[in-house]
Regions:
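N-terminal cationic amphipathic segment used for targeting or macromolecule association
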Residues: 5-6, 21, 36-37, 51, ...
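Alpha-helical interaction segments
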Residues: 15-16, 31-33, 40-41, 68, ...
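A short, charged, amphipathic alpha-helix used as a generic interaction element across diverse proteins
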Residues: 63-71, 76-91
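Negatively charged, low-complexity tracts enriched in Asp/Glu with abundant Ser/Thr
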Residues: 1-36
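Terminal low-complexity, poorly structured segments
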Residues: 9, 18, 33, 58, ...
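Short aromatic-glycine-(Arg/Gly/Cys) micro-motifs in beta-strand/loop hairpins
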Residues: 38-71
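Intrinsic-disorder-associated interaction segments
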Residues: 1, 6, 47, 77-78
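Short stretches within intrinsically disordered, low-complexity N-terminal or propeptide regions
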Residues: 9-10, 25, 40-41, 54-55, ...
């Protein structure tokens, strides 16, 4: 199992989905060109709890119904969702 697969399981991230489905499950998400970025919260006692995730459109359908595929999840956890999204934008 790859690190990406482990992170997807830990944070319950679907490996493929649509922006619409992901937006219904995560409150902090952004269309960013051909990528779709999400920040999520994973409780860890007295430690930073936010992570970033990057999805990529699998075809030219950039609408909310186009398929996206998980390509990166932060190994680091951040103090807030803004820092998690900033990480995702740099990927």
């Amino acid at each position: 199992m790859t690190n990406l697969e482990k992170a997807a399981r830990t944070y319950c991230l679907p490996e493929t989905t649509t922006p619409e489905n992901l937006a219904c499950r995560w409150t902090c998400n952004v269309n960013f060109g051909k990528r779709f970025l999400a920040a999520g919260y994973y409780y860890t006692y007295k430690e930073p709890c936010y992570y970033g995730a990057v999805y990529e459109h699998t075809d030219d359908d950039l609408s909310c119904e186009g398929e996206i595929r998980l390509i990166a999840v932060s190994e680091e956890r951040f103090e807030d969702n803004g820092h998690a999204l900033a990480w995702a934008m740099q990927q």
